[in-house]
Amino acid sequence: MSKQQEQDTPSFGEIRQRLQAGEDFDLAHRLQEREYEMYYNHNRNVNGTIVGDRKKTREEQIAEDEHAASLRRLGHAERSMSDEEYARQLQEEMDRLDASIQMDKEAQLREDARMAWLLQQESSATPAPSRHSGDLISFEDQPQQSSNTTTSSSCQSANNS
């Protein structure tokens, strides 16, 4: 072999070093690929979990909202029924009160009619009271005075002549 060839031919140590460098590069490349794959899989799992959780959360929220809406409807229905019952009771009470007032008015009218009839019977059964009242002056009850009579007689005589 010539010197030129010997110089161009790498030594065993160099070849071994190059092979080790190639193996190291290959190993580093495989490790890096594995790391990327693990990171990618981890992200995919996390994102899948997030998406799944988001869907599940949305479904649970919808179910909870529907349940709350049904409870509100039930509460409204119960309040409506209790309001209707209360209104019915109030109406019955007002009807009873109106009936009681009407019966009281009718009883008062009957009592007034009875009293009027009694007064009429009493007034027709007793003799008519004298026209004179203790407060009034009656000219019929007064004794005639002679001076008035003479005065009126003389006035009449003078008028006649």
Curated annotation (Swiss-Prot):
Biased composition (Low complexity): 144-161
Recorded coiled-coil stretches: 82-107
Region (Disordered): 1-20, 55-84, 118-161
Polar residues composition bias: residue spans: 1-10
Top-rank taxon, per record: Eukaryota
Keywords of the record: Coiled coil
Name of the molecule in the record: Uncharacterized protein R10H1.1
